């Protein structure tokens, strides 16, 4: 039996002998998903392993494979520390002293398990030999600290502890640092007996022990004398009178000869030293107070000084006008916009031809909205309030996109400063990370604090504006904690005149994180928590690990993680494991959310540090690319980007585009040379230049966060790493108010679920339930077990809950705050109560009188484990729905610039007039264009649903794409990608591009839905229907005899997939649209335009068998399982992306009766590493100009495509980039261009200038 199961017989389990190794079938810290994967590889019935339980501390989980399904049994300890397999009610319980006994019994047949335990699945071997240290690439190695306390030391295998044995303790005398151990040993060996005899004879002292102590402390006499002598000199600086006792002791040359007298003298000296130290402090204090009383009055304390005032900033702009306006006002006008943040005013100064000036002043409350242009990165629309609540919009062209961003930041700061709200809607956060190389920092680190240097930096007019929160993460920081904190506070005070308050400081070895906030925010911070995790050998030794801080800012939770991961080019897998260990073991945030890892526990989580991911490229190629400032090829081989694409680390995290050179490994004292050679005893070590120092973040869905800068300094050269900075604009919520104090008659909000369906990556066939957590709930709620489940594939399980199984949730918060709340869901099994996946759903889009759809992914322990969708509604009384516009919603993105010239500007989304509820939609509206279907704001439906709360404006894309200078045109024929939602995180987005064949089935209509008439600037978009029998899941092997073998781990056909890349809306023109009732919006209103295709879409999956090693359970080539769970589903539904033929429109078929889902990232099916290129054209214009549909009549002017065609026609296409960059992007505006304007755009040749002007004159 022992040979079969790998365990000793009863009574001889691993816990019976303390030094025995752990049995092969036991896997410490193995996740449930990894256990199922190991068993799937084993592939034989009766394969088993034992792992730690994820739900109960001290318990175990026995996993058994039978008929390709994994069965899990919980092994629980009882009150007497016996172990027993959890059984159904009425089944007798068998108790065991050790796991070995338990496994030995159940290895026999017919013992109550699904099958006997036959084949133990052993642990995988370590990726790296245990003797290899982290600092394999030459980083400074710190001496390892002793292990953690005994609570974390492995215990022997027994009823309640994992099977491992601790090392026997080393006697203390062996580690004693001085010679006292020898003296003690001699006394105990010889003189001890003499003292014992003396005591027995009636002696009252121990002469031999006294002599031993006196001999041991003899050197201390001279040391105390030296200290007393030095302190006496220091004392005379403040007081001329010296201490007579100290003088007498120092003049005493001959110490007593007897041991007892010698000890008495030493004790006297120590007593005098203690009093002398305190006396010196009192003398110094008195002397300094006397000096200050005679000195002139001291200035006001710096802590009471206000922050430096922000000077008035001026911006040179041009007024962007239409051709019709130009005929009235003549030449294009130039303005100076002066922003007075302190005074709350914006002054528009216009210079007239006769040198006169005309200016208009607008107070902060009369600036209603800022509208950023997608097409022109330096163009901004400003909506001003005129008399009688009328508004006027003016469009300005700034010198550069960076100036436009600075102007927007100043106006937001002005709005915030003069807001009537008691609590802020938005704060700014600075994140800094720096590996200091075990060297003290230079005196001046201002460039780090002010985000100056290389990459995406702040404009000079905004760098001095203090941030609300500063977070500094350092590695290899040899400065003491208090000294480091004082250095940071001093630097910030010198820079801002503010005394920043330290909120938290956490250290692990030389890894530190410090958080400082403005004094005005100190009372808004609560629930501060700190934690640390060691990731060295056995997660105990070494100098690598992570520290973290979390807190609440009013009602918004923040988490910050600073880490130092394993170094070495070849240690990618170990770095990945470091990340997963930190994710699982770092204890931060609300303890009630222990079922969720820290990536889901916070509204905003920032993760930064020396991640140590390297570049997989030859050193000379890397240096060549860096010298040419070409970073795109290097980012393609960046290990962190590659691992994120494979969904192995930082799942759904975001990172701003990298536009600065690698920050490691520089020659100390310079930023001109990379020191990529390191001489070591084992040979020469190569450290290729790499972006080791990174800042990433992850935020809850429908929250506001924008990265304003991401770069590194170029003037701090003490370390071989450059400091990295990032600044963020983050939306925050007010402190929530409990509803318990309200009257009982007050209307109550509640959350109802109609149905939920989850696809879970598992080979188990157990039942499941859902737990619901939220700060708006008094306690967590749970559903009943699912009432339906099915599986078309062995490695995926679809589970469903109807409304009868789902609870009704009753929030305890005031209704106004619900739109800022989120629900956290975890899907757990009934057999082991272990989580199979967690997710977050925002309530903002769910508020309304009708049910709304959500769809999002599930993850567990940092790995993607499936997805979940459902129908729910958050019912809120209309009269109590909070609709206050947030400050960050004040800036929006112009989505329809072509039509904006002829329409009155919208002041804000929340203030739009609702559509009349009496008008019945026309039949054609059922299949109208999707121009409104996936847009953020909703108009109230005829059913009387209250208007949805306003959302934040979409955030602008990075200003400069990789390898493309500012102002460079996009490639012709390639549409620009849509803008990212301002809820700028990849954890949530409106569902777009979902293949129709995977949406809920609907009875076919006998007649094709009529094509709607095109509205202004909109185009009908449809997706051809699939021909029956054409779309089959691709087969893994042609010769497979069973469905399960041929399917591998393909998901079931109705697996709800992530949205395809936007290019999937362009399909071959040969297929016919599916007859159906058409497309409907969320509330039966207008449809909305789908976004255009990505500028660089991924190629579709080629037909034929999928590559081997892609799916779970198959032998992969190497250990790279890069295909994520939801990519598996995507591969089943990938479609061709050829553009439509001439004259053909794309129609989306009818089965969109379900409301559009709202909880998936817009880039769900593509890697998150590389931000899309710059947006050059609005969504509707792209579709209107590029889709040759007869319904899509154009009303806007020619865009960039028209400009390019005109320049090519006259042979001057070389000037297109310069003209567009300077705002001349439309032929309608060119009629007013002058020679001066042409020169500014780069046209210097007189002949070319004359040709351009003559051609424009002829075209009038």
UniProtKB/Swiss-Prot annotation:
As stated in the Swiss-Prot or TrEMBL entry, residues carrying the post-translational modification Phosphoserine are 136, 243, 355, 892, 1133, 1259
Q: Which residues carry this modification: Phosphotyrosine?
A: 888, 988, 1164
Q: Give the SUPFAM superfamilies listed for this entry.
A: DNase I-like (SSF56219), SAM/Pointed domain (SSF47769), SH2 domain (SSF55550)
**Which major enzyme category is it?**
hydrolase
Q: Which UniProt keywords apply?
A: Cell membrane, Cell projection, Cytoplasm, Cytoskeleton, Hydrolase, Immunity, Lipid metabolism, Membrane, Nucleus, Phosphoprotein, SH2 domain, SH3-binding
Specify the protein name.
Phosphatidylinositol 3,4,5-trisphosphate 5-phosphatase 2
- The residue ranges of the SH2 domain are 25-121
Q: Supply the PROSITE patterns for this chain.
A: SAM_DOMAIN, SH2
Query: Which positions carry Phosphothreonine?
Result: 960
Q: How does it sit in the membrane?
A: Peripheral membrane protein
Report the EC number(s), separated by commas if there are several.
3.1.3.86
Short sequence motif SH3-binding: positions: 946-951
Question: Where in the cell does this protein reside?
Answer: Cytoplasm, Cytosol; Cytoplasm, Cytoskeleton; Membrane; Cell projection, Filopodium
Q: How is it modified after translation?
A: Tyrosine phosphorylated by the members of the SRC family after exposure to a diverse array of extracellular stimuli such as insulin, growth factors such as EGF or PDGF, chemokines, integrin ligands and hypertonic and oxidative stress. May be phosphorylated upon IgG receptor FCGR2B-binding. Phosphorylated at Tyr-988 following cell attachment and spreading. Phosphorylated at Tyr-1164 following EGF signaling pathway stimulation.
Record note on quaternary structure? Interacts with tyrosine phosphorylated form of SHC1. Interacts with EGFR. Upon stimulation by the EGF signaling pathway, it forms a complex with SHC1 and EGFR. Interacts with cytoskeletal protein SORBS3/vinexin, promoting its localization to the periphery of cells. Forms a complex with filamin (FLNA or FLNB), actin, GPIb (GP1BA or GP1BB) that regulates cortical and submembraneous actin. Interacts with c-Met/MET, when c-Met/MET is phosphorylated on 'Tyr-1356'. Interacts with p130Cas/BCAR1. Interacts with CENTD3/ARAP3 via its SAM domain. Interacts with c-Cbl/CBL and CAP/SORBS1.
Activation and inhibition:
Activated upon translocation to the sites of synthesis of PtdIns(3,4,5)P3 in the membrane. Enzymatic activity is enhanced in the presence of phosphatidylserine.
What is the catalytic activity of this protein?
a 1,2-diacyl-sn-glycero-3-phospho-(1D-myo-inositol-3,4,5-trisphosphate) + H2O = a 1,2-diacyl-sn-glycero-3-phospho-(1D-myo-inositol-3,4-bisphosphate) + phosphate; 1,2-dioctanoyl-sn-glycero-3-phospho-(1D-myo-inositol-3,4,5-trisphosphate) + H2O = 1,2-dioctanoyl-sn-glycero-3-phospho-(1D-myo-inositol-3,4-bisphosphate) + phosphate; 1,2-dihexadecanoyl-sn-glycero-3-phospho-(1D-myo-inositol-3,4,5-trisphosphate) + H2O = 1,2-dihexadecanoyl-sn-glycero-3-phospho-(1D-myo-inositol-3,4-bisphosphate) + phosphate
Q: Where is the composition biased (Pro residues)?
A: 159-171, 940-952, 998-1013, 1050-1061, 1090-1108
């Amino acid at each position: 039996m022992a040979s079969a199961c790998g365990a000793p017989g009863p009574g001889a389990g691993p816990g019976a002998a303390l030094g025995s190794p752990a049995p092969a079938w036991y896997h410490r810290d193995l996740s449930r998903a990894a256990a199922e994967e190991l068993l799937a590889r084993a592939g034989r019935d009766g394969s088993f392993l034992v792992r730690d339980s994820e739900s109960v501390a001290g318990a175990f989980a026995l996993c058994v494979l039978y008929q390709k399904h994994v069965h899990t049994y919980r092994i629980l300890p009882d009150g007497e520390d016996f172990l027993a397999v959890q059984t159904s009610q009425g089944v007798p319980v068998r108790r065991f002293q050790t796991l070995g006994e338990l496994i030995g019994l159940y290895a026999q047949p017919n013992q109550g398990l699904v099958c006997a335990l036959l084949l133990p699945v052993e642990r995988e071997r370590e990726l790296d030999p245990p003797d290899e240290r982290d600092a394999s690439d030459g980083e400074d190695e710190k001496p390892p600290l002793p292990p953690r306390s005994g609570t974390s030391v492995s215990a022997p295998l027994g009823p309640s502890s994992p099977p491992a044995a601790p090392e026997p303790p080393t006697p203390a005398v062996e580690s004693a640092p001085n010679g006292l151990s020898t003296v003690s040993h001699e006394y105990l060996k010889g003189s001890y007996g003499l003292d014992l005899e003396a005591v027995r004879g009636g002696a009252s002292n121990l002469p031999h022990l006294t002599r031993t102590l006196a001999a041991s402390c003899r050197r201390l006499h001279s040391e105390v004398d030296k200290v007393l002598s030095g302190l006496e000199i220091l004392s005379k600086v403040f007081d001329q009178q010296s201490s007579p006792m100290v003088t007498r002791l120092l003049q005493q040359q001959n110490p007593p000869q007897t041991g007892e007298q010698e000890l008495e003298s030493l004790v006297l000296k120590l007593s005098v030293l203690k009093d002398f130290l305190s006396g010196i402090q009192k003398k110094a204090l008195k002397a300094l107070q006397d000096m200050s009383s005679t000195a002139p009055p001291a200035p006001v304390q710096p802590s009471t000084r206000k922050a430096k005032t922000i000077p008035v900033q001026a911006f040179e702009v041009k007024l962007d006008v239409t051709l019709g306006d130009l005929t009235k006002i003549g030449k294009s006008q130039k303005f100076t916009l002066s922003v007075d943040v302190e005074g709350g005013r914006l002054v528009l100064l216009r210079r007239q031809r006769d040198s006169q000036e005309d200016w208009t002043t607008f107070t902060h409350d009369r600036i209603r909205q800022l509208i950023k242009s997608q097409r022109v990165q330096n163009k901004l629309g400003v909506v001003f309030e005129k008399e009688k609540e009328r508004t006027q919009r003016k469009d300005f062209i700034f010198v550069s996109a960076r100036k436009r961003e600075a102007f927007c930041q100043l106006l937001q700061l002005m709005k915030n400063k003069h807001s009537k709200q008691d609590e802020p809607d938005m704060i700014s956060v600075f994140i800094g990370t720096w590996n200091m190389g075990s060297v003290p920092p230079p005196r001046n680190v201002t460039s780090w604090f002010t985000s100056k240097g290389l990459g995406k930096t702040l404009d000079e007019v905004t760098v001095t504006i203090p941030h609300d929160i500063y977070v500094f993460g350092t590695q290899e920081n040899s400065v003491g904690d208090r000294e480091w904190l004082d250095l940071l506070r001093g630097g910030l005070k010198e820079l801002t005149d503010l005394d920043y308050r330290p909120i938290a400081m956490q250290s692990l070895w030389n890894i530190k994180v410090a958080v400082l906030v403005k004094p005005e925010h100190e009372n808004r911070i609560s629930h501060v928590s700190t934690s640390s995790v060691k990731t060295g050998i056995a997660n105990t030794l070494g100098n690598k690990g992570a520290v973290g801080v979390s807190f609440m800012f009013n009602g918004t939770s923040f988490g910050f993680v600073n880490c130092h991961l394993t170094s070495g080019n070849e240690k990618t897998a170990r770095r990945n494991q470091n990340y997963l260990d930190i994710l699982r073991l770092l204890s931060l945030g609300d303890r009630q959310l222990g079922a969720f890892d820290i990536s889901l526990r916070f509204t905003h989580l920032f993760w930064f540090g020396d991640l140590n991911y390297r570049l997989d490229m030859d050193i000379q190629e890397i240096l060549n690319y860096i010298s040419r400032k070409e970073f795109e090829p290097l980012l393609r081989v960046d290990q962190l980007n590659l691992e994120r694409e494979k969904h192995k680390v930082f799942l759904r995290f975001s990172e701003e585009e990298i536009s600065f050179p690698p920050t490691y490994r520089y020659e100390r004292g310079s930023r001109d040379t990379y020191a990529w050679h390191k001489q070591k005893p084992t040979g020469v070590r190569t450290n290729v230049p790499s972006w080791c120092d990174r800042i990433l973040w992850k935020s809850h869905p429908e929250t506001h966060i924008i990265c304003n800068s991401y770069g590194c300094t170029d003037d701090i050269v003490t370390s071989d790493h450059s400091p990295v900075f990032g600044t963020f604009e983050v939306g925050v919520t007010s402190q929530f108010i409990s509803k318990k104090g309200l009257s009982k008659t007050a209307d109550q909000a509640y959350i109802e679920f109609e149905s939920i369906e989850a696809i879970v990556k598992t080979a188990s066939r157990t039942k499941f339930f859902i737990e619901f957590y939220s700060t708006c709930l008094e306690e967590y709620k749970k559903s009943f077990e699912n009432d339906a489940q099915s599986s078309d594939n062995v490695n995926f399980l679809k589970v469903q809950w109807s409304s009868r199984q789902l609870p009704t949730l009753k929030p305890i918060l005031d209704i106004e705050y619900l739109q800022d709340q989120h629900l956290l869901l975890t899907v757990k099994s009934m057999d082991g109560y272990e989580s199979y996946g967690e997710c977050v759903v925002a309530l903002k889009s769910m508020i309304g009188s009708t049910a709304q759809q959500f769809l999002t992914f599930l993850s567990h322990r940092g790995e993607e484990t499936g997805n979940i969708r459902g129908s729910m509604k958050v019912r809120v009384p209309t009269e109590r729905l909070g609709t206050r516009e947030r400050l960050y919603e004040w800036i929006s993105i112009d989505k329809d610039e072509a039509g904006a010239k002829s329409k009155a500007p919208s002041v804000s989304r929340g203030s739009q007039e609702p559509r009349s509820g009496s008008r019945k939609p026309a039949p054609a509206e059922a299949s109208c264009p999707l121009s409104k279907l996936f847009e953020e704001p909703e108009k109230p439906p005829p059913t009387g649903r209250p208007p949805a709360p306003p959302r934040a404006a979409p955030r602008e894309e990075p200003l400069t794409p990789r390898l493309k200078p500012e102002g460079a045109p996009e490639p012709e024929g390639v549409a620009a990608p849509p803008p990212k939602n301002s809820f700028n995180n990849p954890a949530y987005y409106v569902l777009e591009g979902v293949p129709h064949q995977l949406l809920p089935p609907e009875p076919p209509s006998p007649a094709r839905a009529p094509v709607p008439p095109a509205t202004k600037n909109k185009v009908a978009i449809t997706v051809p229907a699939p021909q029956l029998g054409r779309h089959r899941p691709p087969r893994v092997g042609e010769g497979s005899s069973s469905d399960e073998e041929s399917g591998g781990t393909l998901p079931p056909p109705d697996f709800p997939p992530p949205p395809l890349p936007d290019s999937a809306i362009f399909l071959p023109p040969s297929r016919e649209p599916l007859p159906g009732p058409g497309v409907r919006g969320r509330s039966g209103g207008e449809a909305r335009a789908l976004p255009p295709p990505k500028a660089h879409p991924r190629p579709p999956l080629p037909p034929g068998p999928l590559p081997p090693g892609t799916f779970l359970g198959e032998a992969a080539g190497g250990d790279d399982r890069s295909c994520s769970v939801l990519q598996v589903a995507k591969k089943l539904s990938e479609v061709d992306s050829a553009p439509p033929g001439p004259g053909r429109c794309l129609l989306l078929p009818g089965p969109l009766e379900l409301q559009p889902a709202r909880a998936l990232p817009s880039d769900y099916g593509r890697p998150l590493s590389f931000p899309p290129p710059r947006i050059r054209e609005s969504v509707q214009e792209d579709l209107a100009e590029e889709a040759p549909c007869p319904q899509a009549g154009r009303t806007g002017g020619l865009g960039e495509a028209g400009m390019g065609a005109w320049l090519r026609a006259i042979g001057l296409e070389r000037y297109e980039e310069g003209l567009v960059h300077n705002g001349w992007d439309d032929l309608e505006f060119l009629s007013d261009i002058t020679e001066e304007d042409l020169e500014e755009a780069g046209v210097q040749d007189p002949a070319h200038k004359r040709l351009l002007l003559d051609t424009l004159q002829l075209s009038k």
